[in-house]
Amino acid sequence: MPRFFTNEIDEENICLTGPDAHHVGFSLRMKAGEPLTVCCNGIDYNCNVRSITGDTVYLDLVEKHRCAAEPTVDVTLFQAVPKLDKLEFIVRKSVELGVTRIVPVLTRRCVSRPDSKDFAKKLVRLNKIAEEAAKQSGRGIVPEVAPMVSYKEALAMIKELDRTVLLYEEEGGRSFGDVGFEGVKSIGLVIGSEGGFDKEEAQAAVETGAVQVWLGKRILRCETAPITALSILMFLTNNM
């Protein structure tokens, strides 16, 4: 069923306008009576097309319910900035797996080092990828790709979360299963770029409250690590 997102909705007068209306009328060529879903803040509004007039699609509400695909935990991925193609892949797959937001972080070992102005130009495309992935995977929200922040700024954000884990390749960290996520509502996941984190960065995260987690003896690529970690996290929090 076609899926569309909106930030606000009037249940008595649900309609689509702009590019979404054009997509319904011209790309999908939908007719009166055909079903589609409008998502607003994690709620699915299942509707039927009533009529299409100009650049507006008028809808009749059939039922509404909480989106079953939305996790019960709020997960923020703090991803050290990799090369753009890898970041696009990470955004798409992270959204499919249930992340709430993605915060690109500039760390010492980042190979790609865009300045804030250059990165801002890429944000439009990254958020478009997030929207496409949200539609494809049946999400109830479009996860945000936030502006790039410094590592210091990321650590300040971590303090506001219930639990944060840092993936670190050196032995000595806990496994995910040893961390404990019972009753936790907000989780941070901190993952390095191609070069990982240096010891000072890892220690700074631990001092901020992050738990150092080790994924095993195999070294994962930076685009594989978030997929692995998010899959484990969703399983452990009963969100698979």
Question: What residue ranges belong to the model's regions?
Answer:
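N-terminal positively charged helical leader segments and presequences
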Residues: 1-66, 119
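Mobile, glycine- and charge-enriched loop segments
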Residues: 36, 60, 66-78, 185
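Generic structural signal for residues in well-ordered beta-strands
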Residues: 59, 142-146, 212
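Short, acidic/turn-prone active-site loops that include or flank metal/cofactor-
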Residues: 64-65, 194-195, 217-220
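RNA substrate-binding interface of SAM-dependent RNA methyltransferases
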Residues: 68-163
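Active-site/ligand-binding-proximal alpha/beta "capping" segment
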Residues: 161-196, 200-201, 210-214
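Structured adenosyl-cofactor binding patch, chiefly the S-adenosyl-L-methionine
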Residues: 199-240
